[in-house]
């Protein structure tokens, strides 16, 4: 039913966004939803994706009521994001491709995982040598030709050195025996970083003259100004249709998924409110966000001056929310250092962060709406 609702939204809803090229993206998505199903008979290869889950929440661990027994959903969601983006990427390069997820697949993901050397069958269940059974799967089938990996030998036939000193001490890999299980030594609510060691203050270090902060319309941000020609014709032409994104295949592949998430940023609120005390609510939001993969999350008030005065359509904004959940997605220092600023990495790393937040932020906002409170991902 949710897929049908999204298809109807693509036909009937008008997005309120000044994102460059959003009209092209939405038209493309609408056509995709209306297109008849196609066969994968010509697909000769598969790219299989394995997404590891953290440890299971402890029985009385604070903030974990929303995430208990939801590992399959978490891994399936994150794996689906990557599979859909990579399938789109390969299509942009000219190779017919399709993503297969835990909810919509034309292939047996378990069999593909064994064939691709990601898992073996141990006592009737799929298992990874280092991760065990804490994972979910997705795949991309394609005509793109690449060398396949070989299947793994059963666990009983694996050499002792695979789990020897190098694995225990981490001398040859970032992942090792001491950090193999995410959040093994941390509570989900605390996050992976030791934020509790940082000094906190009552107000921001920078003085903000709140009564006199001017609210400005969405039209004043740089992306909008470029599109409307405020920065000159050359930059306007470079932004037309989202050209600065479309010129690199990886970022354009992510942009299509981002377009679909625009329709999921907001939605109807449940009629019945679930009452939670503020401390419990904060713990639930933080633990869920970290469990889903956000790198840092903080909760703050959302003062009036933080809102634009007018939205993308020019309509006045009466600030609907007085609280905010702020999330950070790490783009990766090595990735940023490896980019010249004018290559396929530069835009793609930003789009990856936008996409990851749109996915996880959208999930958290939806959960809050399910509890009877208005919430929107930005």
Where are these regions (language model features)?
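Catalytic cores of enzyme domains
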Residues: 2-161, 286, 292-378
């Amino acid at each position: 039913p949710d897929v049908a609702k999204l298809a109807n939204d693509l036909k009937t809803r008008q997005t309120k966004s000044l994102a460059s090229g959003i009209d092209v993206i939405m038209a493309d998505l609408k056509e995709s939803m209306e297109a008849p199903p196609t066969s994968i008979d010509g697909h000769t290869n598969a790219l299989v994706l394995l997404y590891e889950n953290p440890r299971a929440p402890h029985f009385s661990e604070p903030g974990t009521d929303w995430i208990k027994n939801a590992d399959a959903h978490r891994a399936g969601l994150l794996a689906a994001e990557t599979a859909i983006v990579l399938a789109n990427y390969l299509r942009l390069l000219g190779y017919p491709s399709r993503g297969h997820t835990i909810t919509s697949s034309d292939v047996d993901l378990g069999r593909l995982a064994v064939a691709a050397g990601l898992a073996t069958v141990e006592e009737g269940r799929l298992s990874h040598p280092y991760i065990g059974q804490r994972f979910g799967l997705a795949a991309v089938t394609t005509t793109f030709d690449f060398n396949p990996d070989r299947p793994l030998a059963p666990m009983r036939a694996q050499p002792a050195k695979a789990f020897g000193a190098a694995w225990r001490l981490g001398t040859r890999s970032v992942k090792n025996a001491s950090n193999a299980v995410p959040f093994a030594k941390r509570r989900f609510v605390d996050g992976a970083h030791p934020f509790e060691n940082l000094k906190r203050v009552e107000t921001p270090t920078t003085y903000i003259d709140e009564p006199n902060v001017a609210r400005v319309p969405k039209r004043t941000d740089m992306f909008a100004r470029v599109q409307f020609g405020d920065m000159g014709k050359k930059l306007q032409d470079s932004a037309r249709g989202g050209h600065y994104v479309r010129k690199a295949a990886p970022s354009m592949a992510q942009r299509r998924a981002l377009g679909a998430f625009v329709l999921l940023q907001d939605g109807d609120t449940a009629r019945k409110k679930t009452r939670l005390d503020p401390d419990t609510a904060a713990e639930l939001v933080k633990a869920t966000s970290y469990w889903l993969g956000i790198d840092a999350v903080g909760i703050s008030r959302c003062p009036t001056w933080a809102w634009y005065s007018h939205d993308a359509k020019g309509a006045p904004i009466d600030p609907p929310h007085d609280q905010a959940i702020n999330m950070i997605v790490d783009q990766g220092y090595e990735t940023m250092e490896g980019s010249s600023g004018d290559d396929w990495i530069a835009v793609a790393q930003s789009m990856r962060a936008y996409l990851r937040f749109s996915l996880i932020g959208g999930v958290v906002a939806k959960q809050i709406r399910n509890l009877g409170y208005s919430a929107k991902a930005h």
